Amino acid sequence: MYLNPEKKKEFFAKYGKSNTDSGSPEGQIALFSYRISHLTEHLKVNRKDYNTERSLKMLVGKRRRLLDYLKRCDIGRYRFIINELGIRR
């Protein structure tokens, strides 16, 4: 499996406040970014997988909403996560 609990804890430890902090926007954005990159690679091979394409668009929307929330609440954390993950703005 591409995303196991250890991998999630790694993302939360690196971008969240602790290993079990799954609620912080930074941890969720990092997790969504990993899933988005994985689905993008899948769609390069399977071009007609429309269900995966829809789920990718939904994930991008979720990440966008979290980024907008973070930008409204704390611009410093927003800039850090954008630079750290290499997300275009």
Swiss-Prot record:
Keyword Coiled coil annotated: no
GO CC annotations, alphabetized: cytosolic small ribosomal subunit
Keyword RNA-binding carried by entry: yes
Pfam families linked: Ribosomal_S15
GO molecular function: rRNA binding; structural constituent of ribosome
Gene3D superfamilies associated with the record: 6.10.250.3130, S15/NS1, RNA-binding
UniProt keyword terms in alphabetical order: Ribonucleoprotein, Ribosomal protein, RNA-binding, rRNA-binding
GO biological process, one term: translation
Family: Belongs to the universal ribosomal protein uS15 family.
Subunit structure, interactors included: Part of the 30S ribosomal subunit. Forms a bridge to the 50S subunit in the 70S ribosome, contacting the 23S rRNA.
Protein name (Swiss-Prot/TrEMBL): Small ribosomal subunit protein uS15
